[in-house]
């Protein structure tokens, strides 16, 4: 559990860079591209690495690679928010690879749904 009070990340504004990561299940590329297009239409600058399209059975790539992508986005001071491309099974696999201390030093908004519960719980209680 976290001993310190929760940190409030900054609000996002049009023009901000937003990272899109795939911490859990893979997704249809067309739906992803439509979502990225909508973020652009709203004035944001979505960013993602090519690994977001990886697939390994029922998850979006190797756990260590998904965690590296999340940590890279989290540690980028120019990115105020991170969006999960999709929920689904697999987010719990990232937890051993995440750095609480590093994440706590740079509060971010993290947006996700469905079965990102393990990751959202980790961020809420530890970061």
Feature locations, PLM:
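ATP/NTP phosphate-donor binding region
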Residues: 1-78
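Active-site histidine-anchored catalytic micro-motif
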Residues: 40, 59-127
